[in-house]
Design a protein with these regions (language model features):
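N-terminal signal peptide c-region/cleavage motif recognized by signal peptidases
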Residues: 9-11
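N-terminal export leaders
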Residues: 1-2, 6
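N-terminal intrinsically disordered, low-complexity segments enriched in P/E/S/T
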Residues: 13-160
Length: 160
């Protein structure tokens, strides 16, 4: 369920995503139906905070100790954008790109983390958004394939 006011109905059956009022931190483009910028869905931090929040405590290759990551599930972000596809291209602030099967967002509780140990993440700390799989909860995810899909400094998701 989306936060009240996040979406407004359009006569075409698509949904209009409310426009961001703050700095855009995430753009979802490609095969999306719910837009607020022509053909893209743009999110500011309050919009992401308005989605249901989830946490996972897990280790990653970048952190030796288990850390707590909190944010909306990737599948909820995609649902807010009305995304439908087979592949997600994740693009970071430094232009790092990695492809993730769309199904990963549905099968795993992948989080678009906005908090690290309950604090907002600065760019120098891999923020402001970090795609995190529940590595410690699902041992089969502890592999180079899934680690490479955990893009930090996420800025764009292209739905293909």
């Amino acid at each position: 369920m989306l936060a009240p006011g996040l979406l407004g109905a359009l006569s075409s059956g698509a949904q209009a995503l409310q426009p961001p009022t703050g700095v855009v931190v995430l753009t979802v483009g490609g095969r999306v139906r719910n837009t607020n910028d022509g053909r893209r869905a743009q999110f500011d931090m309050p919009m992401l905070e308005g989605l249901p929040q989830h946490s996972t405590v897990t280790r990653t290759p970048g952190f030796a100790q288990a850390r707590r990551f909190t944010g909306p599930l990737l599948r909820d972000v995609l649902a807010a954008a009305g995304a439908q596809g087979t592949l997600l291209r994740l693009v970071a602030l430094n232009d790092y790109q990695v492809d993730m099967p769309y199904d990963d967002a549905q099968r795993h509780d992948v989080i678009v983390a906005r908090l690290l140990d309950d604090k907002p993440m600065a760019v120098r700390d891999k923020g402001p958004l970090f795609v995190i799989y529940p590595f410690d909860a699902r041992p089969e995810l502890r592999s180079a394939v899934y680690y490479s899909r955990s893009a930090w400094q996420l800025r764009t998701i292209e739905v293909l």
